Amino acid sequence: MKQLFRQWYDLSEIKKELTTRNWFPATSGNISIKVSHEPLTFLITASGKDKTKTTPDDFLLVDHVGVPVLETELRPSAETILHTHIYNNTNAGCVLHVHTTDNNVITNLYSDAVTLQNQEIIKALDIWEEGATIHIPIIENHAHIPTLGENFRKHIQGDSGAVLIRNHGITVWGRDSFDAKKRLEAYEFLFQFHIKLLSIQGGVSNGANSYS
C-alpha cells in the first residue's frame, strides 16, 4: 500500500509540472507509473479529466491489460493500450504521452521518422558519442485503437524510448519517472530547436507540408 501511495504522489507531481508547461491542452494526454511488477499493475490518468486540477480521481489502478483493479466509475485513458504494451514488453517504470504544438508539427514535416543530430541535449537520452544522431519513429494516428496499439508495439525496443503519432503527440517511456520526464523534456527541446532552425532556413527540401 505504501508503494501505491508513493507512486500516486510521484505521478501527481509530474502531472502538476507538465501542466505548468501547457502540455495537457483540452484534457489531452495521459501518463502512468508502474506500481508492481508481479502482478503487473500501474496507475494511469482517468479519461476526460481536466489535468490542470488535482483531485482524488486523477488516477486509477489497472492491471496488465488495462482493466481497473478496484471497482470504480472512472475509465482509463483511451490510449491505455500503449502503456500496457510498454509495461508488458520492457522494464520501464513510467510512460508519458503529451500533445504539444511542436511534436505535432514535426509529424507533419516527416513521413516515417524524424532524424535529429549533433545536439548536446541528446546526452539526456543516455547517448554519449560526439555528434550523435537519433531517429524517432512516426506512426499513423489510427482511430481503431487495437491497430494503433499494434503499430506502436513494433517500435518498443527497450526500457526507454519514444514514438510520435501523427497529429497525436509523443509517447515517451523511461526506467522511472525521473528518466521518463528527462527524456520528454529533451525531445521537446529538440523539436522546438529543429522547427525554429527550419523557419530560419526556409523549410525542408523534401517533406515540408507533405503530411499536413
UniProtKB/Swiss-Prot annotation:
Binding site residues for Zn(2+):
H97, H99
Pathway the protein contributes to: Amino-acid biosynthesis; L-methionine biosynthesis via salvage pathway; L-methionine from S-methyl-5-thio-alpha-D-ribose 1-phosphate: step 2/6
In short, the EC number is 4.2.1.109
Describe how the cofactor binds: Binds 1 zinc ion per subunit.
Q: Which cofactor does it need?
A: Zn(2+)
| Gene Ontology molecular function terms on file | methylthioribulose 1-phosphate dehydratase activity; zinc ion binding
The record's listing under SUPFAM superfamilies reads: AraD/HMP-PK domain-like
Instruction: Report keywords, A-Z.
Output: Amino-acid biosynthesis, Lyase, Metal-binding, Methionine biosynthesis, Zinc
Q: Which reactions does this protein catalyse?
A: 5-(methylsulfanyl)-D-ribulose 1-phosphate = 5-methylsulfanyl-2,3-dioxopentyl phosphate + H2O
A GO CC term?
Answer: cytoplasm
Give the GO biological process terms: L-methionine salvage from methylthioadenosine
Could you tell me which NCBIfam families the record lists for this protein? PRK06754.1, salvage_mtnB
The task this protein performs is described as:
Catalyzes the dehydration of methylthioribulose-1-phosphate (MTRu-1-P) into 2,3-diketo-5-methylthiopentyl-1-phosphate (DK-MTP-1-P).
Q: How does it assemble?
A: Homotetramer.
The family line of this record is: Belongs to the aldolase class II family. MtnB subfamily.
In its UniProt entry, what is this protein called? Methylthioribulose-1-phosphate dehydratase
The organism encoding this protein is Bacillus cereus (strain ATCC 14579 / DSM 31 / CCUG 7414 / JCM 2152 / NBRC 15305 / NCIMB 9373 / NCTC 2599 / NRRL B-3711)
